[in-house]
Amino acid sequence: MFYTTVGKIIKELNLECLTEISGIEERKIKDMNLNRPALQLMGFFEYFDEQRVQIIGISEMAYLKTMTPSQRRDAIERLFQRNIPCVIITSNQEPFEEFLEFSKKYGVPLLRTQEVTTRFMTNLSTFLTHELAPRITRHGTLVNVYGEGVLMLGESGVGKSETALELVKRGHILVADDAVEIRKVSEKTLVGEAPEIIRHLIEIRGIGILDVKNLFGVGCVKESERIDLVIQLETWKQGKEYERLGLHDQYIEILGIKVPTLVIPVRPGRNLAIIVEVAAMNNRQKKMGYNAAKALTERLQKQMSRGNGAE
């Protein structure tokens, strides 16, 4: 199971740590869902998921103010007794002393943000969705071409990196080369990025490692990109039938999501960069509802119908 840590969300979301607890930065978060513990402060813990980050907003704090000191103490202790990853107070509110006391007693990090509850929960949810999403690493190259995320797959040496370099020269954006980390961030969306150690780098045989960001500028690189199209490059195989009309869409399944795919044969003289550009534009056009192959078929059928009618 994938996880992130309290230390990462402190750094990413600029949180203030209100209590000093050993090992706080390594404390694991395994659930991308969040919880506002209104019912739990009332004493109802049925169906309570202890793995979720607990958010104390203005409403929860206002409810605690209506309690007597002994009721408030019991309510806060019941929450901290659970094996929760952390408690975050929003809107820069001052915590009750009981929050600080039981945070230290039970070793549960107590954090605070200046952001309002709704905005903070949106930002934290987005971060956790990315960090905890199912993922795999594929050997390939990911580029942004006319706004379409194109993942190029194929055997080593088939020309993925060279094609990506030519695309960058033509004004497109490199996301990842050689290794692409693919995350399933929703039931319909895959996002790819480069491992941090090789981010913005590209390998060209005969030259070596190139830093695309330094060579071409920050506008030519991107940290992550949605995967809209998969292009599988392969050496041209004599006698193999390749798609010539494009009537029947093909798909590849990655992490349970079907992504449109094309098989592009590679041989000397073919300009792969232009082919990838056109493939990206054509894929975008299909998503907008137009398919050139189907339009041609319809025109042919109409012409044949007119011809049969004339007879």
Swiss-Prot record:
It catalyses: [HPr protein]-L-serine + ATP = [HPr protein]-O-phospho-L-serine + ADP + H(+); [HPr protein]-O-phospho-L-serine + phosphate + H(+) = [HPr protein]-L-serine + diphosphate. GO terms for biological process: regulation of carbohydrate metabolic process. Residues 265-270 are annotated as: Important for the catalytic mechanism of dephosphorylation. Residues 202-211 are annotated as: Important for the catalytic mechanism of both phosphorylation and dephosphorylation. The active site is at H139, K160, D178, R244. Its cofactor is Mg(2+). Belongs to the HPrK/P family. The Walker A ATP-binding motif also binds Pi and PPi. Catalyzes the ATP- as well as the pyrophosphate-dependent phosphorylation of a specific serine residue in HPr, a phosphocarrier protein of the phosphoenolpyruvate-dependent sugar phosphotransferase system (PTS). HprK/P also catalyzes the pyrophosphate-producing, inorganic phosphate-dependent dephosphorylation (phosphorolysis) of seryl-phosphorylated HPr (P-Ser-HPr). This is HPr kinase/phosphorylase. It comes from Caldicellulosiruptor bescii (strain ATCC BAA-1888 / DSM 6725 / KCTC 15123 / Z-1320) (Anaerocellum thermophilum). The lineage of its organism: Bacteria, Bacillati, Bacillota, Bacillota incertae sedis, Caldicellulosiruptorales.
